[in-house]
Regions:
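Single-stranded RNA-binding regions, centering on S1/OB-family and related RNA-binding modules
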Residues: 1-117, 122, 126-130, 136-154, ...
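Short beta-alpha connecting loops at secondary-structure transitions
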Residues: 50, 142-143, 362-372, 384, ...
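N-terminal small/polar loop signature for handling phosphorylated ligands or for N-terminal nucleophile
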Residues: 144-146, 253-254, 268-345, 353-356
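An N-terminal, well-structured beta->alpha segment
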Residues: 199-243, 247, 256, 264-268
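Gly-rich Lys/Arg/Thr-decorated short loops/hinges at beta-loop-alpha junctions or inter-strand turns
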Residues: 207-218, 278-287, 506
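A structured phosphate/pyrophosphate-recognition subdomain
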Residues: 240-247, 251-253, 355-511, 528-529, ...
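Flexible glycine/proline-rich, aromatic-decorated loop/lid segments
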Residues: 346-347, 351-366, 561-575
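Glycine-rich, acidic loop segments that terminate in or are immediately followed by a histidine
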Residues: 391, 498, 503-615
């Protein structure tokens, strides 16, 4: 045999086709029979060492050198024992002659052994097997590995590893799955090559369709389109890689329209591109926020839930999508929390942006970035982004921009264009009714998303009769509550004329309004403002809804900059605890109750400095 012999060690995944007659292999004793000894060459190939070919006494699990005498047509392997001094041979690993399969092709290979190279995107330990969710360049599927009930298989495999999986393609509960016979982690250049291949494919699959363009003619939307495509691509990629998505949105009609449009697109995209039919329930969560910014309370809740899911279910940390909030300086504390956990954050908002927060964001869609303003509402942005994520939902959500626009009292030309799109299907008054119904129902939902109720209000459930009856009921109840509130508040509204010529009105929403019911202070202030705007037609009007430690600001015909005013007041009144912001002409301010009189006085002084558009 020469001075140095070669002994082959059969690698994982190798089969009978990978061995050759006459060669020597390193094996392991599996068991004994009267006619000989069974030898394992790896976890799936074994042969028979006839008792006439045994040269030494062995125990179960002992290593042994064997030569392949014959491979029979039925696959049985005849072996004979070989004894060699340890220093007279070298060991060479036999690797599987790999023919890689793609996850998308498993349905055509049921019952056959496959080899997959993929990224581990989730690891879930069940009471039986360990379920590895893996993602390659074609899709996502589960790989089930069993050691013993409830025991973690392949503990060396971690979330984010690139692995080579060997196993049988099966179908379980109408879902494709790989029954794992072996799995090992790829390292170095081998892993890098697989990652590069997967990333290249994901980049192409995540790219929004090129033929999707804005629904209407709009310079603002056209200028924003590249950033909207970027944001949509990030969302599509999150779905393709099984990254959970948390969608946080302002809990008003505009924010709801923005969020539900994206929710509708993403849920369908998840169902079209995933393995587990229930995964849309745990890969996507929509949560309303009371404030028009990402509060510490909200980010803390999100962090608590996402970290528990990461530990318990082996999920990736999520992508956070903020809609109708997320653009202002007030979001900064929450963004610092997301930075600690290296979370991906994207924003689609129409509040006046603060450039200091952009360093925390992967994408930021905001009309102010391209010379627009808050008239291009979050619901308009959300609908266009939803179409980029999944164009198939377009007809379902075509009325959302109009509902959002009338809800936020948009005066932008885009609103008229969106209303014309649904001419003959919904009137402007019907859009207003849906907007009011959303505001009314969300008030009672508090922090719950009310997914199915909201879908009924927006006529997404293919139940038009129920939609009409529900909206009519909610609008009737809401209008009755608003009328009662206005009858209570209006006699107590105080007025004065500012040096700028603007009419200023003070409405105390604490002392002269029903509390803890609909409409809340912000909505009540807006309704008072609407009445006063009609009463003082073509005149500049500013309305302050005053609470014990807050003020709601509504204005028309005054060139205000509320975020700038808040910053100025905070600098000038360090003991007042001032915070707040919003749009340029619509917003709110918080302060400490003990400084209420001084803050109101300073606020009136600041508002007087803004020029009024006098007729």
């Amino acid at each position: 045999m020469g001075n140095t012999n070669t002994v082959y060690r059969l690698g994982p995944g190798c089969e009978v086709d990978d061995i050759a007659e006459g060669q020597i292999y390193l094996g392991k004793v599996q068991g004994f029979a009267t006619f000989g000894t069974f030898i394992l060459l790896n976890d799936r190939v074994k042969g028979l060492l006839h008792k006439s070919n045994v040269k030494s006494e062995k125990k179960e699990r002992d290593q042994i050198l064997v030569q392949v005498n014959q491979i029979r047509p039925n696959g049985n392997i005849d072996l004979r024992e070989v004894t060699l001094p340890e220093d007279s041979y070298e060991t060479q690993l036999v690797t599987k002659k790999i023919t890689l399969s793609r996850l998308a092709d498993l349905k055509n290979k049921i019952g056959r052994n496959v080899t997959i190279e993929a990224d581990v995107v989730q690891i879930k330990q069940t009471s039986g097997p360990t379920i590895f969710t893996i993602c390659d360049d074609s899709g996502v599927e589960d790989a089930a590995a069993f050691t013993e009930a409830g025991v973690r298989s392949y503990p060396e495999v971690n979330l984010g590893d690139v692995v080579r999986v060997f196993g049988e393609a099966t179908r379980r509960n109408n879902q494709m799955q790989i029954e794992v016979s072996d799995m090992h982690v790829l390292k170095g250049t081998e892993a890098d090559a697989v990652r590069a291949r997967i990333n290249k494919a994901l980049e192409a699959r995540a790219e929004p369709p090129e033929d999707v363009v804005p629904l209407i003619e709009s310079d603002v939307l056209s200028a924003l389109w590249p950033e909207m495509r970027k944001l949509a691509k990030i969302i599509r990629r999150a779905v393709l890689t099984q990254q959970p998505i948390i969608l946080r949105h302002h809990a008003d009609a505009d924010g709801i329209c923005a969020a539900v449009s994206v929710e509708t697109a993403v849920m369908q995209y998840i169902r079209d591109n995933g393995g587990d039919p229930d995964q849309d329930n745990y890969l996507f969560r929509r949560s309303p926020s009371k404030a028009p910014f990402y509060e510490i309370e909200d980010v803390t809740r999100d962090l608590d839930m996402m970290l528990k899911d990461n530990v318990r279910f082996g999920q990736k940390l999520p992508l956070i999508l903020l809609m109708d909030n997320g653009s202002t300086e007030e979001d900064m504390p929450s963004y610092k929390m997301t930075e600690v956990y290296q979370l991906d954050v994207v924003v689609a908002d129409h509040h006046h942006p603060d450039e200091t927060i952009d360093k925390y964001l992967l994408a930021h869609v905001n009309p102010y970035h391209v010379g627009g303003d808050f008239g291009v509402t979050a619901g308009m942005l959300g609908t266009e982004i939803a179409r980029l994520i999944n164009p198939a939902v377009e007809q379902k959500i075509l009325h959302f921009p109009a509902v959002a626009g009338v809800a936020d009292r948009s005066e932008a030309p885009e609103l008229g264009a969106y209303l014309s799109l649904i001419d003959g299907k919904y009137t402007k008054d019907e859009c207003k009714d849906m907007a009011l119904a959303l505001d009314y129902e969300q008030y009672w939902l508090r922090f719950n998303d009310g997914r199915e109720i909201v879908k009924d209000i927006l006529n997404l459930n293919n139940a038009p009769d129920r939609h009409n009856r529900l909206v009519t009921l909610l609008v009737t109840e809401a209008n009755a509550a608003i009328e009662d509130q206005m009858n209570t508040m209006m006699p107590h509204v105080k007025d004065q004329v500012l040096v700028s010529g603007a009419n200023l009105f003070l409405a105390d929403v604490e002392m002269f309004a029903h509390r803890f019911t609909f409409p809340p202070p912000g909505k009540s202030s807006g309704e008072v403002h609407d009445i006063l705007c009609k009463r003082y037609e073509n005149q500049p009007v500013v309305t302050l809804g005053l609470g014990p430690d807050f003020a709601v600001i509504r204005s028309r015909g005054v060139r205000m900059n509320i975020p700038q005013m808040v910053r100025s007041m905070r600098d000038e009144m360090p003991g007042a605890g001032i915070s707040g912001g919003g749009h340029l002409v619509v917003g709110s301010i918080k302060f400490v109750e003990g400084m209420r009189s001084e803050v109101i006085e300073k606020m009136i002084e600041k508002i007087s400095e803004f020029p009024a558009d006098l007729q």
